[in-house]
From Swiss-Prot:
Limits of the Protein kinase domain: 34-821
Keywords for the protein's UniProt record, in alphabetical order: Acetylation, ATP-binding, Cell cycle, Cell division, Cytoplasm, Cytoskeleton, Kinase, Mitosis, Nucleotide-binding, Nucleus, Phosphoprotein, Serine/threonine-protein kinase, Transferase
Modified positions (Phosphoserine) in chain numbering: S362, S442, S545, S619, S644, S655, S711, S861, S864
The organism of origin for this protein: Mus musculus
Protein name per Swiss-Prot or TrEMBL: Serine/threonine-protein kinase greatwall
InterPro entries referenced in this protein's UniProt entry, alphabetically: AGC-kinase_C, Kinase-like_dom_sf, Prot_kinase_dom, Ser/Thr_kinase_AS, Ser_Thr_kinase_AGC
Length: 865
């Protein structure tokens, strides 16, 4: 019995597994699944082909991405896709799929075999009044539906009116349409779009169709290049981005395969780091105060614990380098306290054997640069700011020291790391250089500015290493500041010689004291120290490399606008809205602290386990007790600009408004305000609340209210480019005059179509477009006379639609009340018999499109996409 029941359970489990495995995952189809039957027509922005998939015919509109980019029409392709996806009207062409490849965009629509009205008009010459009324009535219903859903067609003409198998009219070609949704469409927009009542016709879409219609259209996909880094930049998990709390950068080093090199590098760095707790004293650039005086700034102190970051949009002098190494969640990004204690135990025994060494953890490395197992050294890239290049060199000996004979920033930052755990499969490329195939700006400006800054730095090189202990009153001292077990070190300042020196004091577990923390006027070595999870806490020694410091040193100013502000944050909780990620590759997303171990970039001294447990109890809280502050701090405190040596300190920085504005931390929320520019603007918003646990309570006592400027939107609001788009004969006067326009432009075009239906010629037709425009502005209409005279009702209806003043122009309500449309059954119009019903030879017949193609001298014979 037991064996029988067990067999039944096994059979049942197998059946369930088989059933589950058969469930297909919804996905958009590939364009390869469609077979091209023949070309249909060609327009200004693409070609239309007759395609087939699964026995069903489709009209496939193919648009080249390169053409759209060259014509600056990328947003119009998006608008056309959105307009067709949102429309569920029997008088609008139905869109099934929106697909794309590396070079093309494919809009898969229903195929209407009757051709377009322009071709039919060429055959008929002109329409009878009854036929014209029916066509105009159906187009009016389509326009009314579109306008109620915030869509303006803006290119209404007989060429864009297709005839269905039953002879009804359907609008197409929304390439110049305007969708007032002001955001990307989502699944709910497509699923809940109201549709006009039409029995026996279903407008529902399959999951694959919905996924294709809400996908983002990428116009900058490199053709013919399968760059794994570019793909991982957008599709891979953001572990590397979370490690740096940074943003996706346009530069990267090619990486063949993602390996576990990150975790091994981190572990080896921690081991070497523990044995080298000191970092060499480095003198930073000394002309900050002179530059600030020249620029008319007067910041005196720094109270902000959070610095805001953005890309330097003017010259990209401080690019954020992408960390190409993507580590998995199981690669050991989270370290427990036991691992920290082991690292700390090694540090006490290795201090005497290691010389003073500056460890530079390069943000760019290649997995092929790891030597074989048993090797004692790993060469990391050395960055030389004078040559602006990355190189990989073999070390001469095991213990590498800084070559102080080099001038400027051309100093070696090589290091030696024990890598006995690495495998032999990583032997390969060495001596690689930085590539620029993903860079959208020339590095000439960076080279020139770096040379200029190096010259200025050499002039002040003699003052390096100066230690100043005087208190200048420009800084505040805070004691007992705990950041999740990360103990900051003591900083001293000097203002007399305009020199800022970074000093570190070696701490031992036997002799620990409460350090004083002060803010640097221009701390190139200060980096963000992120909080780990409540269970995992970091207390090992780590240093920031010269590469990271040069790339992430910030420039924040409270009273002047500097381009290129970068952000370093310690523990301030950033609450940011998530903008559209298809444009925009930058985000302020919080990392997953349960699975992520962030390597701090600031020099930190080890804490005993007892001190760290005190921090683990509530890692989200930061307690700080301000000591006696200087007298200068009792007045209004401004935010001090932080400028790195590599940034453009002497450049004209007032040419672009700053994307960042900083307010007091006790009442600040950071919100993202997308202004249509790159990068997105970030502005704080006053909330009128008490400081959070992540903010310094010292600022609450100041009593000064830092108010955000009321004009929080940075940059100009998105507006039309002012170009006149459309066919000249059907353009409304407001489009020609460049004034604001709305749905009334479609009703003007409908009046032009009514005149053309009844006469065969547009009312403002002339020899040149300029003459056509003059006829439109003068409203010069050649009314037929004699036997060809139009009826009074038809002429009256055209007069209402062709009104110069768009506010007085007729709309749907006026047309329904007009005598010309008195006999139209508006509710059942789609069920009435039409005067022309197509009679094709077969289902693939495209002869009804030939009349228009011949009139425009189009030869449709090629299959090239």
């Amino acid at each position: 019995m037991e064996s029988a029941s067990a067999s039944e359970e096994n059979e049942g489990g197998a059946a369930i597994e088989e059933c589950v495995s058969r469930i297909p995952v919804p996905r958009p189809p590939s364009i390869e699944e469609f077979t091209i039957v023949k070309p249909i027509s060609r327009g200004a922005f693409g070609k239309v082909y007759l395609g087939q998939k699964g026995g069903k015919l489709y009209a496939v509109k193919v648009v080249k991405k390169a053409d759209m980019i060259n014509k600056n029409m990328t947003h119009q392709v998006q608008a056309e896709r959105d307009a067709l996806a949102l429309s569920k009207s029997p008088f609008v062409v139905h869109l099934y799929y929106s697909l794309q490849s590396a070079s093309n965009i494919y809009l898969i629509m229903e195929y209407l075999i009757g051709g377009d009205v322009k071709s039919l008009l060429h055959i008929y010459g002109y329409f009878d009044e009854e036929m014209a009324i029916k066509y105009i009535s159906e187009v009016a219903l389509a326009l009314d539906y579109l306008h109620r859903h915030g869509i303006i067609h803006r290119d209404l003409k007989p060429d864009n009116m297709l005839i269905s198998n039953e002879g009804h009219i359907k609008l197409t070609d929304f390439g110049l349409s305007k969708v007032t949704l002001n955001r990307d469409i989502n699944m709910m927009d497509i699923l809940t779009t109201p549709s006009m009542s039409k029995p026996k016709q279903d407008y529902s879409r399959t999951p694959g169709q919905v996924l294709s219609l809400i996908s983002s259209l990428g116009f900058f996909t490199p053709v013919g290049e399968k760059d794994q880094d570019s793909a991982n930049m957008f599709s891979a998990p953001k572990s590397a981005a979370q490690l740096s709390r940074g943003f996706i950068c346009p530069m990267s080093v090619d990486q063949k395969e993602p390996t576990s090199y990150s975790s091994k590098l981190l572990k080896s760095c921690f081991e070497t780091l523990s044995s080298n707790p000191e970092i060499p004293v480095k003198c930073l650039t000394s002309n900050l105060l002179q530059c600030r005086k020249r620029l008319g700034t007067s910041s005196t102190s720094s109270q902000s614990h959070t610095f805001v970051s953005s890309v330097e949009s003017e010259c990209h002098s401080n690019p954020k380098w992408e960390r190409d190494c993507q580590s998995t969640e199981s690669s050991g990004c989270a370290m427990s306290w036991n691992a920290v204690e082991m690292l700390y135990a090694k540090s006490t025994s290795a201090i005497k054997t290691k010389t003073e060494l500056e460890l530079a953890l390069s943000p760019i490395h290649d997995s092929s640069a790891i030597p074989a197992a048993g090797s004692n050294q790993v060469t990391l890239p050395r960055k030389c700011f004078r040559e602006i290049s990355w190189e990989a060199r073999d070390p001469d000996n095991e213990n590498m020291t800084i070559d102080k004979g080099q001038s400027g920033f051309c100093q070696s930052s090589q290091r030696s790391v024990n890598s006995s755990a690495t495998s032999e499969e990583h032997l390969g490329k060495r001596n690689y250089k930085r590539n620029f195939h993903l860079v959208d700006s020339s590095p000439c400006q960076e080279i020139m500015q770096s040379k200029k800054n190096c010259t200025e730095y050499e002039a002040n090189k003699e003052r390096q290493g100066c230690r100043a202990n005087q208190s200048t009153g420009l800084t505040t001292e805070v004691q007992n500041l705990k950041l999740s077990g990360c103990e900051s070190q003591q900083l001293d300042y000097a203002n007399k010689e305009n020199i800022v020196t970074y000093l570190t004091d070696r701490q031992t577990p036997e002799k620990l004291h409460i350090p004083t923390i002060a803010k640097n006027l221009m701390s190139e070595l200060d980096e963000d120290c992120e909080l780990s999870s409540k269970k995992d806490c970091l207390s090992s020694n780590s240093v920031c490399s010269d590469e990271d410091r040069a790339l992430k040193t910030t420039c924040v100013d409270s009273d002047s606008s500097f381009p290129g502000v970068s952000m370093m944050e310690s523990s301030l909780e950033i609450q940011a809205l998530e903008p559209d990620k298809s444009i925009r590759d930058y985000s302020f997303e919080e990392p997953n602290t349960e699975d992520l171990f962030v390597l701090p970039k600031c020099q930190e001294n080890s804490l005993p386990q007892d001190d760290c447990h005190a921090c683990i109890q509530d890692s989200s809280q930061v307690s700080a007790h301000p000591s006696k502050a200087p007298k200068a701090l009792t007045s209004k405190i401004n935010v001090v600009a932080f400028r790195s040596f590599n940034s453009h300190i002497n450049a004209s920085t007032n040419s672009e408004p700053s994307k960042i504005s900083i307010t007091s931390l006790d009442a600040m929320d950071i919100s993202c305000d997308y202004s249509g520019s790159y990068p997105m603007a970030v502005s704080p918003t006053e909330k009128g609340r008490h400081y959070t646990s992540h903010q310094t309570p010292n600022q609450v006592k100041l009593g000064t209210s830092y108010r955000t400027p009321k004009s929080v939107r940075r940059g100009a609001a998105p507006v039309d480019d002012g170009r006149i788009l459309g066919t000249p004969d059907y353009l409304a006067p407001e489009l020609l005059l460049g004034t604001a326009h709305g749905p009334a432009v479609d009703w003007w075009a409908l009046g032009v179509c009514l005149f053309e239906f009844l006469t065969g010629i547009p009312p403002f037709n002339d020899e040149t477009p300029q003459q056509v425009f003059q006829n439109i502005l003068k409203r010069d209409i050649p009314w037929p006379e004699g036997e060809e005279k139009l009826s009074d009702n038809a002429q009256s209806a055209m007069d209402m639609l062709l009104t110069i003043d768009d506010s007085k122009r007729a709309g749907m309500r006026e047309l329904k009340q007009h005598p010309l449309f008195s006999e139209v059954d508006w509710e059942n119009l789609q069920h009435q018999t039409m005067p022309f019903v197509p009679q094709p030879d077969d289902e693939t017949d495209t002869s009804y499109f030939e009349a228009r193609n011949n009139a425009q001298h189009l030869t449709i014979s090629g299959f090239s996409l």
